[in-house]
Structure formats: C-alpha cells, structure tokens
C-alpha cells in the first residue's frame, strides 16, 4: 500500500529500491510521481492512463493546449511509439540519448493515449539518469512534465518540487540536485526541415553538426 506523499532518498540503496517499488505501485494505481532526471525534476504518470495524465495537467495548472511529453527507458522503445522514424531521428538519438534532447515526432495512430492537444505528435526523450531509467524500464513510457506549477520555476531538487506540488503527488524520488538544472533542448522533426523549438543544454551547433545542416536553418 502506497502512503500519500512519501519521499525516498535514492542515495540510500534500500530507500532507492523501496522508492522505485512504491513509484511503480503509485503509477499503476493512477497516481502521480516526482522523479529526478538529468535536466530538471519531472512529475510523471502512466502515459496510457488518461485520467492520470489529466490529473498531471491539473496538478500543474496547465491546459490541454500544453500537452505532456513522454520519457522512455531505452532507444528501441521509440520504434513502437512513432508513425515512422523521421529523417535525422536516428542520428540525433545515437548522438544525444540518453541526454538532454527532446524530439517531437508524429506518433503511431494506434496508440491509446491522451497527452493533451498534441495534434498527432508527441515529444520524446530518454533521460540520462539511472533512477529515471530504472523506473521507466519497470513501468514503460511515462507522461512527464517539469515538476512545477505552470508559470513557476522548474524544480531542480525534490524540495522545490514538494513546495509546489505537495500532496498532489503520491511518491517523491529524491536523488539530489539535477545535473543540468535546465530544461531539455527540443527539436521538431514533424516537418521536412528540422527546427529547434527550445534552446537548452544541447547546442544548436552540435545538433547542426550531427544533421549535416547549417545552424541557422534550425532556428524556428
């Protein structure tokens, strides 16, 4: 039985194991979890639980017009989530995953999820954080957004997340301060030409080099 608002110190092996198990139970029960990632802390739900994703948006005070992204625990997971692998996707995944790069792609039409008004697209990322990967490998793809109330700073530690989200979250996994302390770079691969929608830790120059394009062509 998962008690509400549990916090687990993942620096302690026993607490980490119990925390992962509690987070898995919470997610399977339709509850929300705060988890560490390499960029900022995230608030997450089972990506295929529509009610839980709606609760996530509500906890953040966010509308359907700002859909939730999805974190995955392995490279191959993306194959089952996309309609087709767009040009450049494999190159970017090989270069930057796991890491601070999110890719917007057209999702497979058969997927039974509702992440908000995403118009057939989904933002995917594989985080560079062992706790996040362990959880994702246990539960599968998770709908995850930054662990903050909309309009407030993204939390870079568990105390910042708890201060904003409190009892709305069932389990908090504490792994200390985020390494990057900045939201991921976002690249849109849904059109013929890749575009950077948000600057972040992965630079325009590095992305352009991998794609073999001029950096200026990536600026939205």
From Swiss-Prot:
Record flagged with keyword Lyase: no
Example of a GO biological process term: regulation of translational fidelity
GO molecular function, one term: double-stranded RNA binding
One GO CC term, this protein: cytoplasm
One matching Pfam family: Sua5_yciO_yrdC
Positions of the YrdC-like domain: 17-202
Compartments (UniProt record): Cytoplasm
EC number: 2.7.7.87
SUPFAM superfamilies cross-referenced by the UniProt entry: YrdC/RibB (SSF55821)
Class of enzymatic activity (EC top level): transferase
Family, as annotated: Belongs to the SUA5 family.
Record's function text: Required for the formation of a threonylcarbamoyl group on adenosine at position 37 (t(6)A37) in tRNAs that read codons beginning with adenine. Catalyzes the conversion of L-threonine, HCO(3)(-)/CO(2) and ATP to give threonylcarbamoyl-AMP (TC-AMP) as the acyladenylate intermediate, with the release of diphosphate.
Protein name per Swiss-Prot or TrEMBL: Putative threonylcarbamoyl-AMP synthase
